[in-house]
Amino acid sequence: MTHCFIRALLRQPVERTPVWMMRQAGRYLPEYREVRERAGSFMNLCTSPELACEVTLQPLERYRLDAAILFSDILTVPDAMGLGLEFVEGEGPRFRNPIRGAADIHRLGVPDPEAELAYVPAAVRLIKQRLGDRAPLIGFSGSPWTLATYMVEGGSSREFRKVKCLMYEEPALMHELLEKLADAVALYLNAQIAAGVDAVMVFDTWGGNLDTEHYLAFSLRYAERVRQQLRLTGRGRIPAIFFTKGGGQWLEAMADAGYDALGLDWTTDIGSARQRVGDRVALQGNLDPVALYARPEIIRGEVRKILERYGRGSGHVFNLGHGVTPDIKPEHVGAMIEAVHEFSPAFHRT
């Protein structure tokens, strides 16, 4: 029987609401920190199929999760395009060769996932071998817009001055960059699908920093271009999830982009979101990650509220509204997951 995570994404009947977490394999887990130290660097961890497999499976050994998500980083794609990714302690990701003009964009090529990114499909194959039928595996990529923000800014940014200036002053150049990125992302996700992932997710972390006109033209347009190129049939139906952090105001437009499910951050009421999108897409989310700092009984209450707001029936995957933070207590994560298991069956009884 198809796993409840896949059925929920396809809005098919389920016996309970499935649950997983963005960044579920991460620094809040002591076992992850041990492997990270053994790896020597974050990039070593990402590029070693054996280590990536180990940390991908860690949260499933600890919790009753309904999906594993490939351990990797969204910036592996621009790294394979020649930008030279490095992670600086206390500073985050940084590119040695950021985009600084038209010539940099013109010379960008679309990387071959089985060559420049071969460690990713290799990790997928290894994870699937060891995961077996325990849970589906999610593959992922950053969205074209989100990848472009890092590539033009040279790393993380709060104001996005450089990338927005390029968008306003040289829109044709920005479109050229985003077209290449959309094709690269689609190729990358298709390689993950061919290697065995059961679902894919596109993370548009920074789309919510745009106004409506520019979100539709420079973010959602290229997420849709990615979706149009995805090969989602073959080994059964492969659901695709799209998540724009801060994108609640554009749900109706996002629901028309062709994805099976939309991720919600915690600023959008999931009940009203369900009314707005109707039966076009499933919804994923959307507990505030900061709620996990609260006492377990508070966490349980917040879980119940979200389940009640969504209401009865399938089409909901429980998740956080963004990634789990590094200093969360693992037992608080467990309280959230167990609350979903305990409370959600009541919303699926006929």
Swiss-Prot record:
This protein's record includes keyword Lyase: yes
EC number: 4.1.1.37
Catalytic activity line of the entry: uroporphyrinogen III + 4 H(+) = coproporphyrinogen III + 4 CO2
Residues annotated to bind substrate: R23, Q24, A25, G26, R27, D73, Y150, T205, H322
Positions marked as site (Transition state stabilizer): D73
Annotated compartments: Cytoplasm
GO molecular function, one term: uroporphyrinogen decarboxylase activity
InterPro entries for the chain: UROD/MetE-like_sf, Uroporphyrinogen_deCO2ase_HemE, Uroporphyrinogen_deCOase
SUPFAM superfamilies referenced in this protein's UniProt entry, alphabetically: UROD/MetE-like
Broadest EC class assigned to this enzyme: lyase
Family, as annotated: Belongs to the uroporphyrinogen decarboxylase family.
Quaternary structure and interacting proteins, as annotated: Homodimer.
Known function: Catalyzes the decarboxylation of four acetate groups of uroporphyrinogen-III to yield coproporphyrinogen-III.
UniProt name for this protein: Uroporphyrinogen decarboxylase
Organism from which the protein derives: Methylococcus capsulatus (strain ATCC 33009 / NCIMB 11132 / Bath)
Gene that specifies this protein: hemE
